[in-house]
Each structure stands twice: as C-alpha cells, then as structure tokens.
Design a protein with these regions (language model features):
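Beta-rich interaction/scaffold domains
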Residues: 2-80
Length: 80
C-alpha cells in the first residue's frame, strides 16, 4: 500500500530525529550517561531505521544528504 503525502512527511520528520540522535550520540551530547553498549545499540537501531526508510522507492524531492551522512557516521561509530 502506498504511503500518503502526510505519511511520507511524518516518516521524513522521524528520519530527521534519527539523524539528530545519531549525530548527538557520536558527538557526546546525548546519552553520555549511558554505557557504551547502550550508546552503540541506539546508534545501530537508528542507522537501521534510516536504511529501511531511505530504501523506500516512493520518495519525492526529499533531500537525503543528512540521512546518507548519518548512516555513514553511524556505521563508522564504535562506542567506547
């Protein structure tokens, strides 16, 4: 079933939240009080979410640059 424009907009917003969280965890401004395992799991979950959403074929003109960059950063991240 095809997503509506409203659903796509909601999904795109959620992707932005994942991008922000990945970047913040990597920068140390989010989840700094959590252990490395929890930070890694958070980044991994959000990368997986972004990969699944980005792979959808019904996107229009949405800019996926931040998503692509967050996926790459998240895949390169190793919590310590």
């Amino acid at each position: 079933m095809a997503r509506t424009d409203a659903e796509k907009a909601q999904d795109y917003t959620a992707m932005g939240h994942s991008v922000e969280l990945i970047n913040a965890v990597i920068a140390g401004s989010q989840m700094a009080d959590q252990d490395a395992t929890e930070r890694q799991a958070c980044v991994d979950r959000n990368v997986e979410h972004l990969e699944l959403m980005k792979a959808k074929t019904d996107w229009g003109s949405e800019d996926m640059t931040a998503t692509t960059n967050a996926i790459a950063a998240g895949k390169g991240y190793t919590a310590s």
